[in-house]
């Protein structure tokens, strides 16, 4: 059990038998009336996001989530195989559980896998990943009909928007949460 004062991003709550992760929260103290907490909760199984409001000080049920360091090994059909960094046990995760993270996975990449009652819940990549541009069109100097970006395909097959000066073979820093371009990696 935890109070609303214990809320933090990433905390997993158990509500009506389902697991929900706090994505965002805000303590609100209005001029009139009692304080309350607005939260944005994400269902760890389905990915559905809902807004929920709690009165300040209310106790809620928390779930015990064990985050373990692992390394991505290879893809086996529709499964992604990871090796636990502590006991070297291999964990095959289905494509549905890996989700959008598959766009940024490289072999030997360190990740974290969250477990609840021995079964994997979700996968966490490092916030930034370094990937090489596999292909992109050359950016033309006078071509400014767009906002100064062009599509680029990364070595993992993911397609992101990059500035016009990026070329095939450049190593980029990419935000793994939303696939946004963060910068070039200096060689």
UniProtKB/Swiss-Prot annotation:
Similarity section: Belongs to the elongation factor P family.
Name the UniProt record assigns to this protein: Elongation factor P
UniProt-annotated location(s): Cytoplasm
GO molecular function, one term: translation elongation factor activity
CC per GO annotation: cytoplasm
PANTHER family registered for this protein in UniProt: ELONGATION FACTOR P, ELONGATION FACTOR P (EF-P) FAMILY PROTEIN
One GO biological process term: peptide biosynthetic process
Coiled coil: none
Annotated function: Involved in peptide bond synthesis. Stimulates efficient translation and peptide-bond synthesis on native or reconstituted 70S ribosomes in vitro. Probably functions indirectly by altering the affinity of the ribosome for aminoacyl-tRNA, thus increasing their reactivity as acceptors for peptidyl transferase.
Assigned keywords, A-Z: Cytoplasm, Elongation factor, Protein biosynthesis
One Pfam family this sequence matches: EFP
Phylogenetic placement of the source organism: Bacteria, Bacillati, Actinomycetota, Actinomycetes, Mycobacteriales
Protein's organism: Mycolicibacterium vanbaalenii (strain DSM 7251 / JCM 13017 / BCRC 16820 / KCTC 9966 / NRRL B-24157 / PYR-1)
Pathway given in the UniProt record: Protein biosynthesis; polypeptide chain elongation
Organism domain of life: Bacteria
């Amino acid at each position: 059990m935890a109070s609303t004062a214990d809320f933090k991003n990433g905390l997993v709550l158990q509500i009506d038998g389902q697991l929900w992760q706090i994505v965002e929260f805000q303590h609100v103290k209005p001029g009139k009336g009692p304080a309350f907490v607005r939260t944005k909760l994400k269902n760890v199984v389905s990915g559905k996001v809902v807004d929920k409001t709690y009165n300040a000080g209310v106790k809620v049920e928390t779930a015990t989530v064990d985050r373990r360091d692992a390394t991505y090994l290879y893809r086996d059909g529709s499964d992604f195989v990871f090796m636990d960094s502590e006991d070297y046990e291999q964990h095959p995760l289905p494509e549905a559980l890996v989700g959008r993270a598959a766009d940024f996975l490289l072999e030997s990449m360190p990740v974290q896998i969250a477990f609840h009652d021995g079964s994997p819940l979700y996968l966490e990549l490092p916030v930034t990943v370094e990937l090489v541009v596999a292909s992109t069109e050359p950016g033309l100097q006078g071509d400014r009909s767009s906002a100064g970006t062009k599509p680029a395909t990364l070595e993992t097959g993911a397609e992101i928007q990059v500035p016009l000066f990026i070329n095939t073979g450049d190593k980029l820093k990419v935000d793994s949460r939303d696939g946004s371009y963060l910068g070039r990696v200096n060689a």
